[in-house]
From Swiss-Prot:
Catalytic reaction equation(s): a phosphate monoester + H2O = an alcohol + phosphate
Protein name per UniProt: Alkaline phosphatase
Organism, scientific name: Prevotella intermedia
E.C. number(s) listed in UniProt: 3.1.3.1
PTM comment, free text: The N-terminus is blocked.
Lineage: Bacteria, Pseudomonadati, Bacteroidota, Bacteroidia, Bacteroidales
Assembly and interaction partners: Homodimer; may be disulfide-linked.
C-alpha cells in the first residue's frame, strides 16, 4: 500500500510497478 514501504522492501517491485 505504501509506496515508500514497497520501495524499501522490494526495489524490483518498484521498478516494475512504478518504473523508477
Amino acid at each position: 500500500t505504501d509506496m515508500l514501504a514497497v520501495s524499501v522492501s522490494s526495489t524490483d517491485a518498484i521498478g516494475h510497478k512504478y518504473g523508477t
